[in-house]
Amino acid sequence: RPWELGSRALQGMRRRLFLAPQVPPLPPRQRVVTAVLAGLLPDMGLWHSLKSLVYPNHIGVADAALAEFDLDDKLFERVDRLSGGERQRVGLARLVASSAALLLVDEPLSALDPERARQALLSLRHTAQNRGATLVATLHHVDMALAHFARIVGLRDGELVFDLPASQVTPALLQGLYASRLDELAGLAPAIDFASPANAHAHATMPCR
């Protein structure tokens, strides 16, 4: 019950959790370095946070996070000069820069081509594994999910359909889950939540609306 927590406990919870939305909240005139370093805000005090808006610290952290997504050449670019896919990757770099132990990612591949999507998933998994964190992502790509994540949870209308290792998710199960949307099984399906394997907890949710 987060709403019952005191300010100190609430700050601690915020430090442990990071949400990367499908469309990251990036003010148009903001520099990429500032956008990425926003991932460190839960670990900063108020004065340090305000100072960082003018004189960014930890530039090396931002540069390394951007390099995970081939964006290190955009470090001082304005975000409104980036493409949609680049802005989405800046949002993911912000997650990489954070120190959170629970990483929640909403449709991180929606604006990316297949190779960028594969690279992004590998970077997210690498981050979670190195940190011992839990990575949960919402995807629309069944093939990517099965290839990159250890555990899949299928939901239909908010109810559990299956909760299995990815290796046990068969075409028959997917056909049952998406009985009215079989054309999407070739690559796209309604929101799929996944979690990183290895050191991270492995969760995945495949809701069928």
Annotated model-derived regions:
Residues 1-18, 48-55:
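ABC ATPase NBD coupling module
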Residues 30-44:
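Q-loop/switch helix immediately C-terminal to the Walker
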Residues 49-74:
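Conserved ABC ATPase "signature" region
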Residues 78-82, 86:
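Conserved ABC ATPase signature
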Residues 103-106:
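Catalytic Walker B motif of ABC-type/P-loop ATPase nucleotide-binding domains
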Residues 139-140:
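H-loop/switch region of ABC-family ATPase nucleotide-binding domains
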Residues 171, 178-209:
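ABC ATPase nucleotide-binding domains
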